Amino acid sequence: MRFADIETAFGQTDQLPAAQAAVAAALPIGMPLPDAQAILVRAGARCQLQRRNPEVIECVYSQRTTIDDYYAADIVWTTALHGEGARVAQISIRRELDKH
């Protein structure tokens, strides 16, 4: 799994449910959190624990792009690993376009 591939396959056509399914297939519920985090890091994300909720690891991948062949923007994929004990209990993913 690579976020660049997920963006190519699903991002531009706004198929978030399909992207969520691809990430969920790579990170099954019950997987050890360190293993899930390692997969996301290899996929290109940067991960850190959320300060307010230490049972959640938030991983962010960003990619620079242009809009209308001129305007700079960042595509940002955020994946949150919700842990229960040392295992993945839930995964949430979102995509945002940050226009400059």
Which residue ranges define each predicted feature?
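Membrane-helix boundary/juxtamembrane interface motif
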Residues: 11-14, 87-100
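Compositionally biased P/S/T/G-rich terminal and signal peptide-adjacent segments
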Residues: 1-18
